[in-house]
Amino acid sequence: MKIGAFVPQGWRMDLNGVTQEKQWQTILDAANKIEKLNYESLWVYDHFHTVPKPTQDPTYECWTLMSALSQTTNKLRLGQMCTCNSYRNPSYLTKVASNIDVMSGGRLEYAIGAGWYDHEYKAYGYDYPTAGIRLKMLEESLIIYKLMTTEENPVFEGCLLYTSPSPRDATL
């Protein structure tokens, strides 16, 4: 069995009471402890607001955290539980994920879903499509992710999403 753990990042109000000046150190300390205890992986949530009640309390963005933690840990696999597909363009997200995978020495775990937290969509100006449309977007995004990591000149035109030829990214 392989075991991972989450670092605090604010989404579950797990940084409440920690001053802003000490929040990053709190996250780092948790990551270091997870690594010292020989866990296999470290996880973050892909959310922008707290839950169960949206507040203005700090919530650290997952891809920014994984980028930083890729440089402050040595052996932990790094994952998101799970990336909301419709928060980021699939071509852009593939680029970010590929970069972090390279920066971390191949330690990225890539988990993605269709999204559900309507408050975050609205707060950040994203459309909140029906579940069926979000699932279709996820389906097309997975094709784009695969093409961008395996094809020399990836091109895709779906019902909802498309991509033009772009440089091939590092393999996820």
Place the predicted regions along the sequence by residue.
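A structural motif corresponding to the C-terminal end of an alpha-helix
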Residues: 33-37, 72-76, 144, 148-152
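Short beta-strand segments at enzyme active-site cores
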Residues: 40-46, 78-80, 109-113
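Short, charge-rich binding segments
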Residues: 68-77, 101-105
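Short linear capping/connector segments at secondary-structure termini
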Residues: 46-50, 81-84, 125
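N-terminal beta1-alpha1-beta2 module of alpha/beta enzyme domains
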Residues: 1-72
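Single conserved hydrophobic/aromatic residue that forms the stacking wall/gate
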Residues: 162-172
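Glycine-rich "substrate-gating" loop/helix at the edge of Rossmann-like oxidoreductase active sites
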Residues: 54-57, 83-88
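Flexible, glycine-rich active-site loops centered on histidine and acidic residues
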Residues: 2-22, 85-155
